Amino acid sequence: MKLFVSPLLALSCLIGNAVAAWPNGPFKTEGRWIVNANGDKISLAGANWPGHGEVMVPEGLQYQSIKDVLSDIKSIGMNAIRLTFATELVDQIYANNGKDVDLKTAFEEGLGKENGTIILQKVLKNNPSFTAQTTRLEVYDAIAAECLRQQIYIDLDNHISEAKWCCGGTDGNTWWGDTQFNVDNWVRGGKYMAAHSKKWPAKITQSLRNEPREPTNNNALRDKSYNWSDLYKYMRQGADAVHEADPNAIIVISGMNYDTYVTPLYSGEKLQPGGEVFNRDDFVGYGKDKLVLEIHNYENSGTSCSSLRYNLYNKGFQAMNESDPNVAEVFPVMLTEFGQAMNGADYNTANTYVSCLSEYLPEVKASWFIWVIVGRYYTRQGIQEFDDSWGLKKADWSGWKNDDYIAKYLKPQIAGTLKK
């Protein structure tokens, strides 16, 4: 008997297989690109979604469901999120005999019993699959599952050690060995989260540490350790731990001075004061094809696009140019934070910044994540329901703060970045 298969059915099967293949990992790096299992080049255009605050649950769920937050991100063309966490989340799991904290405890400890109870009820109303006994990592898992459904990549970012707003030179989280930045706990936390997130198909990268910076109130630590040699030493420790737990993860390495430059890591210069040079062989088994660099830029009051381009290039994007004679090691480089106020005088001051980035990032095909998706936080800097003037979303997360910015600058920036 001869089986007849209609052309329409055959086409639908092909489309179904193509969709099912997303994200088509494992991923690796080839020169300046991240590529999937087919060798297709992957670019990321996304937003930061913080989860490193005192509650240690990703923000905004008192206003929207996980599905709606990600649908809004997807609606303007974005294909990625930078999902942040605090090392303290893992510290608490170890202190609790390996058991994660439930949402009831997380919100009450983060916001106080009265307000925590009120906010939790709003979260549960918007996300009815959760209960008060749902754990924090189960929320992260739900975000990862929805990212898979909506084809949104995840960069999992260790943002801070002590769960709170970041960053400053006196916050105790500046540098390895600072008062709240225990090195062993950091290595353990990165490894734990790598093992946990290994099951997330949408995870494409894992960032080792957000914004290493000078400990301005800790002179002894600054004088002893705030240098490129120690950054390189600690990044190798963290990368080894993440790779051991999740060999498929692409690992993101940051630089000094709030991660505003990574030049010594790709230029071949000696890392001071030790004199060693970045060597992929130091990252045994993965240094050739699992490393990415990241930088941040907040020069949003500048009036010269050429100056901004120059700084972005010479502080990081240069590493993507294999023809540049000053580049010893070629890497993909991601701009994992940039941003500005969304309204008022501060937004107007940033006109050169937003227009320049909207043109330049697609031009260099750099992956990027804007800071930040948030409207109101659960709490920030001691203020509950803090409304972030830099946030893309309105205070109640119901829409965009600045539709003109989205339409005129951000959407073209997204489309240009992701254009094949």
Task: Locate each region found by the language model.
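Chitinase-like catalytic core of GlcNAc-active glycosidases
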Residues: L89, E109-G110, E114, A132-Q150, ...
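Aromatic-lined carbohydrate-binding surfaces of glycoside hydrolases
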Residues: F85-Q92, A144, R149, Y153-N173
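Aromatic- and acidic-residue-enriched carbohydrate-binding clefts of CAZyme catalytic domains
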Residues: A95-R136, C167-Q180
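Fungal secretory targeting signals
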Residues: M1-A20
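Short, solvent-exposed turn/loop segments enriched in Gly/Ser/Thr/Pro and often Arg
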Residues: T84-L89, H159-W165, R209, N257, ...
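N-terminal carbohydrate-binding accessory modules
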Residues: G16-R82, I93-N115
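Extracellular glycoside hydrolase catalytic/binding regions
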Residues: G177-D178, D184-T205, R209-S367, G375, ...
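Residue-level detector of anion-binding/catalytic polar loops
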Residues: N79, Q151-Y153, P332, S367
